[in-house]
Swiss-Prot record:
Family named by the database record: Belongs to the cyclin family. Cyclin AB subfamily.
An annotated GO BP: mitotic cell cycle phase transition
One function term, GO molecular function aspect: cyclin-dependent protein serine/threonine kinase regulator activity
Name of protein: Cyclin-B2-3
TM helices/strands, residue ranges: none
Keywords on record: Cell cycle, Cell division, Cyclin
Location of the region described as Disordered in the Swiss-Prot/TrEMBL record: 86-109
Segments of skewed composition (Basic and acidic residues): 86-101
One Pfam family, short name: Cyclin_N
Length: 429
């Protein structure tokens, strides 16, 4: 059997595979017979084959040196073996020039993983269970943080509603200057406030007596069917007068009746007659005493009855809260509970009104709610109202107990939708 000249060792040098790399050297002879195929054809078939890839071996330097010291494997390059190398897209590294093939830089590198090395590492590529649990927990935390950020973004993007848009054609709403009016109220509301400890200057009175008087006046106001503004102005006149004038205990009810008369003259269209006020006082005072006290109180207050009370803020803030009838009634129930309590004098009228609406919203909905529109128009955020709201919830809890139950009985009627029976928002405390 004739052996092909192209497989002669005189034509093709040894091929060595070191570290997965293929290194070939082609040697031509000077003498070539006329019957033999041109060596250029064979060399062309070998040298023009696709470039061999570099074999990346994941071994340390010492291990690579050990492999390089192994004797090379000699194998003749047949056409079949050359075709296999061509299918694997090999890369030729020229040992003579020591320069990489320019085409090889565009080919993706092939990574060869040593089986022996995998066996040394244990042969198990699965990660420990605690690592998987940690990654799951981290993913869950990241998901929760994304949800919180989305919720915060939704809150930040919540638009402020134009609450006066529906009243632009209503001349009584005074849309053109309603904002200026309430800005004025906010700037001057401190003038309507009294020191929260003014009762210390009264030698014959205490805060419990004040509470009894106001609780009784709330019932009188309800029986006479007077306007809501009248009640708030009456209590404001009483506190401002007692803060600057000493009074004896037996004249306290006279101060209350006279303050109601002054408020009615300022707010009401039809004013109760003096005799009716004397009658509800069980005729404890004469007509002359009522008129004399009226002069004294008006002069002491310098006839100043145009100060903002919680009522003017309540109407505006309820509009900002887009309230319904139920929320409105419950809000007034909350703030009237505060009128009886002496300790609530420390809060500004606007803050009392905002806290009452906030507490009523939480009571009805069962969770904390304070919209951007409410925050914009009231000037108070949820955190600023929380302390006052907690006190209102405490008053709500005890509204039906004790001796001062006038507000509870008033709002436990069908006229006020039995608002006093509403379950208090205990989660705020």
């Amino acid at each position: 059997m004739v052996r092909s000249d192209e497989n002669s060792l005189g034509l093709i040098g040894s091929m060595s595979l070191q570290g997965g790399g293929v290194v070939g050297k082609i040697k031509t002879t000077a003498t070539t017979g006329p019957t033999r195929r041109a060596l250029s054809t064979i060399n062309k078939n070998i040298t023009e084959a696709p470039s061999y890839p570099y074999a990346v071996n994941k071994r340390s330097v010492s291990e690579r040196d050990g492999i390089c010291n192994k004797p090379p494997v000699h194998r003749p390059v047949t056409r079949k073996f050359a075709a296999q190398l061509a299918d694997h897209k090999p890369h030729i590294r020229d040992e003579e020039t020591k320069k990489p093939d320019s085409v090889s830089s565009e080919e993706p590198e092939t990574i060869i993983i040593d089986v022996d090395e995998s066996d040394k590492e244990g042969g198990d590529s699965n990660e420990p269970m605690f690592v998987q649990h940690t990654e799951a927990m981290l993913e869950e935390i990241e998901q929760m943080e994304k949800e919180i950020e989305m919720e915060d973004a939704d809150k930040e993007e919540e638009p402020v509603i134009d609450i006066d848009a529906c009243d632009k054609n209503n001349p009584l709403a005074a849309v053109e200057y309603i904002h200026d009016m309430h800005t004025f109220y906010k700037n001057f509301e401190k003038l309507s406030c009294v020191p929260p400890n003014y009762m210390d200057n009264q030698q014959d009175l205490n805060e419990r007596m004040r509470g009894i008087l106001i609780d009784w006046l709330i019932e009188v106001h309800y029986k006479f069917e007077l306007m809501e503004e009248t009640l708030y102005l009456t209590i404001n006149v009483i506190d401002r007068f007692l803060a600057v004038h000493q009074i004896v205990r037996k004249k306290l009810q006279l101060v209350g009746v006279t303050a109601l008369l002054l408020a009615c003259k300022y707010e009401e269209v039809s004013v109760p007659v003096v005799d009716d006020l004397i009658l509800i006082s069980d005729k404890a005072y004469s007509r002359r005493e009522v008129l004399d006290m009226e002069k004294l109180m008006a002069n002491t207050l310098q006839f100043n009855f145009s100060l903002p009370t919680p009522y003017v803020f309540m109407k505006r803030f309820l509009k900002a809260a887009q309230s319904d009838k139920k929320l409105e009634i419950l809000s007034f129930f909350m703030i009237e509970l505060c009128l009886v309590e002496y300790e609530m004098l420390e809060y500004l009228p606007s803050k009392l009104a905002a806290s009452a609406i906030y507490t009523a919203q939480c009571t009805l909905k069962g969770f904390e709610e304070w919209s951007k529109t409410c925050e914009f128009h009231t000037g108070y955020n949820e955190k600023q109202l929380l302390a006052c709201a907690r006190k209102m919830v405490a008053f709500h809890h005890k509204a039906g107990t004790g001796k001062l139950t006038g507000v509870h009985r008033k709002y436990n009627t069908s006229k006020f939708c039995h608002a006093a029976r509403t379950e208090p928002a205990g989660f705020l405390i």
